[in-house]
Amino acid sequence: MIFMEVTLAIVKPDGVKRGLIGEILKRYENKGLRLKAAKVVTPSIELLEKHYEEHKGKPFFKPLIEYMSSGPVFAMVLEGENAVKLVRMINGATKVEDALPGTIRGDFASSTTYNVVHGSDSVESAKREIALWFPELIL
């Protein structure tokens, strides 16, 4: 079944620093996703703690927050058929050793932390994350 969805994707600081925004956006658009909203921002620790709240207390939480707040990110809302699943497929596996060539992470990630991109993991997460990153956007 086909569902028109919106999802949040983020080019993380390592991807922005390496000039990968255009290549990543092209990969999403080539699969039929449309850019609905986008911004370059250096996220606050407060925003990131809300975004990653399900990981609070895990050993990687603090390093993840520090990394994600270390520089600008390119946050975007993408729209399309089965957008959540499609973005995750294009991104590739979270763990760099599991990411296949041809995926964003398979081609560009240097570690599981420095894995270039974020994509919402469910429709519910997408709604919550978009509300955090784009509070001005009415969906």
Curated annotation (Swiss-Prot):
Q: Which lineage do the record's taxonomy fields give for this organism?
A: Bacteria, Bacillati, Bacillota, Clostridia, Thermoanaerobacterales
The record describes the protein's role as:
Major role in the synthesis of nucleoside triphosphates other than ATP. The ATP gamma phosphate is transferred to the NDP beta phosphate via a ping-pong mechanism, using a phosphorylated active-site intermediate.
The family database entries (CDD domains) matched by this protein are listed as: NDPk_I
In the UniProt record, what gene is named as encoding this protein?
ndk
Q: What is this protein called?
A: Nucleoside diphosphate kinase
Arranged from A to Z, the UniProt key words for this protein are: ATP-binding, Cytoplasm, Kinase, Magnesium, Metal-binding, Nucleotide metabolism, Nucleotide-binding, Phosphoprotein, Transferase
Q: What disulfide bonds does the UniProt entry report for this chain?
A: none
The record lists the catalysed reaction(s) as:
a 2'-deoxyribonucleoside 5'-diphosphate + ATP = a 2'-deoxyribonucleoside 5'-triphosphate + ADP; a ribonucleoside 5'-diphosphate + ATP = a ribonucleoside 5'-triphosphate + ADP
EC number, as in UniProt: 2.7.4.6
Main EC class of this protein?
A: transferase
Provide a Gene Ontology MF annotation, just one.
Answer: metal ion binding
- Identify the catalytic residues: H118 (pros-phosphohistidine intermediate)
This protein's GO CC annotations = cytoplasm
Query: Pfam families, per this entry?
Result: NDK (PF00334)
Residue ranges annotated as coiled coil are none
Q: Quote the InterPro entries the UniProt record gives.
A: NDK-like_dom (IPR034907), NDK-like_dom_sf (IPR036850), Nucleoside_diP_kinase (IPR001564), Nucleoside_diP_kinase_AS (IPR023005)
Species of origin reads Caldanaerobacter subterraneus subsp. tengcongensis (strain DSM 15242 / JCM 11007 / NBRC 100824 / MB4) (Thermoanaerobacter tengcongensis)
**What does the record give as cofactor?**
Mg(2+)
Report the family membership.
Belongs to the NDK family.
Binding locations of ATP: K12, F60, R88, T94, R105, N115
Where found, per UniProt? Answer: Cytoplasm
Q: Name one GO biological process term.
A: UTP biosynthetic process
Q: Where does the UniProt annotation place the signal sequence?
A: none
The record's note on quaternary structure and interaction partners says: Homotetramer.
| PROSITE patterns hit by this protein | NDPK, NDPK_LIKE
